[in-house]
């Protein structure tokens, strides 16, 4: 069981990296392949979630499952972890984009009201966007590790209960 959990851990972490690549492809307009009308927009979710190797996340999942020889039970847990973490990263990016839009709207309102100059807003925007542009913030990483450790404890029949996880 422990060997299978180690394989599961490796597979999940590898798939997370693929998910990060796919998410950055989706958000970076220069790396997104244009659709039939050439605009690059209105892509299907499946094509937007392509990894850097041109395969989808689901293809990577199946590849890991077949190469590792995971049992059906462990494969089910693996898919559940990947689905939850993929959803977390999508939600994280959506929240980050909403935050950027709010900052822009607030700055525009301050500029129109004459409270700040264009130069002041430019300096603040650079700092705000730099601080929000990193995917692996300490809080996000701690949260992922904590949830992952709880998952392993729950489905590992308590074998990993002694693994220390710092959450603060």
From Swiss-Prot:
Span of domain IQ: 78-107
Glycosites: 37, 42, 105
Biased amino acid composition, Polar residues: 32-50
Disordered, as annotated region: 25-52
Signal sequence segment: 1-22
Keyword hit for Cell division: no
Induction: Expression is up-regulated in spores.
Keywords from the UniProt entry: Glycoprotein, Host Golgi apparatus, Secreted, Signal, Virulence
GO cellular component: extracellular region; host cell Golgi apparatus
Chief location of this protein within or outside the cell: secreted
UniProt motif RxLR-dEER: location: 46-63
Domain comment, as recorded: The RxLR-dEER motif acts to carry the protein into the host cell cytoplasm through binding to cell surface phosphatidylinositol-3-phosphate.
Role, per record: Secreted effector that suppresses pattern-triggered immunity (PTI) in plant host.
Similarity comment text for this entry: Belongs to the RxLR effector family.
The protein, known as: Secreted RxLR effector protein RXLR-C06
Organism: Plasmopara halstedii (Downy mildew of sunflower)
């Amino acid at each position: 069981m422990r060997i299978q959990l180690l394989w599961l851990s490796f597979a999940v972490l590898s798939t997370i990296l693929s998910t990060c690549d796919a998410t950055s492809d989706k958000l970076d307009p220069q790396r997104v392949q244009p659709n039939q009308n050439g605009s690059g927009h209105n892509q299907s979710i499946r094509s937007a979630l392509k990894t850097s190797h041109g395969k989808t996340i689901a293809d990577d999942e199946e590849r890991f499952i077949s190469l590792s020889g995971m049992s059906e039970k462990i494969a089910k847990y693996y898919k559940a972890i990947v689905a939850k973490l993929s959803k977390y990263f999508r939600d994280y990016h959506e929240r980050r984009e909403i935050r950027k839009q709010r900052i822009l709207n607030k700055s525009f309102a301050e500029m129109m009201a004459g409270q700040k100059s264009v130069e002041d807003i430019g300096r603040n925007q650079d700092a705000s966007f730099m601080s929000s542009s990193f995917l692996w913030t300490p809080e996000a990483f701690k949260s992922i590790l904590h949830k992952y450790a709880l998952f392993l404890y729950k489905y590992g029949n308590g074998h990993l209960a002694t693994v220390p996880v710092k959450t603060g």
